[in-house]
Design a protein with these regions (language model features):
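Conserved donor-binding/catalytic core segment of Leloir-type glycosyltransferases
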Residues: 5-8, 147, 191-221, 225, ...
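Nucleotide-sugar donor phosphate/pyrophosphate-binding loop at the beta->alpha transition
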Residues: 65-69, 107, 117-139, 206-207
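Nucleotide-activated donor-binding/catalytic signature segment of Leloir-type glycosyltransferases, i.e.
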Residues: 227, 234-262, 269
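Acidic donor-binding loop of glycosyltransferase active sites
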Residues: 264-282, 297
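Conserved acidic donor-binding segment of nucleotide-sugar-dependent glycosyltransferases
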Residues: 313-325, 333-340
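A charged, aromatic-enriched C-terminal amphipathic alpha-helix characteristic of glycosyltransferases
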Residues: 340-373
Length: 379
């Protein structure tokens, strides 16, 4: 009989590329997988996946009310399900997973996409920070099994709580011909900007340097396309209006994962920027960093440890120490105007993608679950 795995998130399932990859790989490895998330009021229909998907409805949409309601609903849902193991994705679903795993006496795992308590939107709010830090201190030591996105975060969890987590990077599936993605743009999709354009894809949240990126576009001779939404959408739109960039900065909104690769491949430059506030940003290794590599486009990224380590090995990006307005515009213009540099970085992307890809990462992922259920074969 197949082992039944449950994974829990607080976001809508349609756009979660990492969880789609993880659940698909474990399903292909022979597990019976269910992914549980939230249902937003304007959520599109779920796509067909090789695993089960379940979306919880909530009255509250954000804030403390949402997290309390969602965790209660999640607890009672999980309590009624048959499962062999349970994996909490980030800190905001860890409590119900811990309680249900104790009640049901089943293995539990923690998938830490980031240092949750050190995110800018948490660390900048002392009351919220204290609540989540208490949850982290109580729960994480009780999750001896888990994985995260890079060695820096894994080392931090070991330093704080004595748990040694594996590293599963957010790299895309290696495709034989990424250029073919361009031909797969949906017929009904809005047209892309004409000529060379700069792309930001991902959450439009606090701490992503939009306060500097948007005004920097005044001095850059190319449009900026933003694919995504988040808690900084209204301030970002206000910045565009403030600087008169309505014809230069384009908001595309949310894009389904299957529709995103052709857009990424059509871009000329990618953007991976984070503010320094919060250790989570400093230790980050964003999905889009690898998405740009696989699309074969050079990018502008912050000179933080995880990005620096990869760039030192493959030189696929221009890194900035300080993501200020002048630094961003200078770096973007360098990529736009220095053809030799651009094509060197582009060629290096093609080499880097052969090493950083999901086919390599999923081997480690599957091994984690094999060890969980059959430890005698790995001792």
């Amino acid at each position: 009989m197949k082992k039944k795995l449950f994974f829990t998130v607080t976001n809508d399932l349609v756009y979660d590329q990492r969880m789609i990859r993880i659940c698909s790989s474990l399903s292909a490895a022979g597990y019976d997988v269910t992914l549980v998330g939230r249902r937003n009021s304007n959520a599109p229909p779920l796509g067909t996946q090789p695993f089960r998907q379940y979306r919880l409805r909530t009255w509250f949409r954000s804030g403390k009310g949402f997290y309390i309601e969602y965790n209660l609903r999640l607890f009672f849902l999980l309590l009624t399900q048959k499962m062999s193991a349970l994996c909490a994705i980030d800190l905001d679903t860890i409590l119900p997973c811990y309680l249900v795993s104790r009640i049901r006496r089943i293995p539990r795992l923690y998938d830490a996409h980031e240092l949750f308590c050190e995110m800018q939107e948490v660390v900048s709010r002392p009351g919220i920070y204290r609540i989540w830090k208490a949850v982290e201190r109580f729960c994480v030591p009780k999750f001896p099994n888990g994985y995260t996105v890079n060695d820096l975060i894994a080392d931090e969890f070991f330093r704080l709580y004595g748990v040694r987590y594996a590293v599963i990077r957010n790299a895309p599936v290696l495709r034989p011909d990424p250029a073919a993605d361009i031909a797969r743009l949906p017929i009904a999709a809005p047209p892309l900007p004409a000529g060379r354009f700069i792309l930001y894809q991902g959450a439009v949240n606090e701490g992503r340097c939009f306060e500097s990126l948007i005004p920097a576009m005044q001095a850059v001779d190319a449009p900026l396309l933003i694919c995504g939404e988040g808690n900084f959408m209204e301030p970002a739109r206000a910045l565009v209006r403030q600087y008169g960039l309505e014809n230069k900065v384009i908001f595309r909104g949310m894009v389904r994962p299957e529709d995103l690769p052709p857009i990424t491949r059509s871009a000329y430059i990618g953007i991976t920027l984070f503010d320094r506030q919060g250790t989570s940003n400093y230790y980050s290794l964003a999905n889009r960093f690898f998405d740009y590599i696989h699309a074969g486009i050079p990018q502008l990224a912050v000179n933080y440890p995880a990005y620096q380590e990869i760039n030192n090995s493959y030189r696929i990006a221009v890194l900035v120490d300080k993501p200020g307005i002048r630094e961003i515009s200078d770096a973007l213009n360098r990529l736009l105007n220095n053809t030799e540099l651009y094509h060197t970085l582009l060629a290096n992307c093609k080499q880097a993608r052969l090493y950083y890809n999901w086919q390599e990462e999923e081997k480690k992922l599957v091994r984690i679950y094999q060890q969980l259920f059959c430890p005698q074969f790995f001792n």
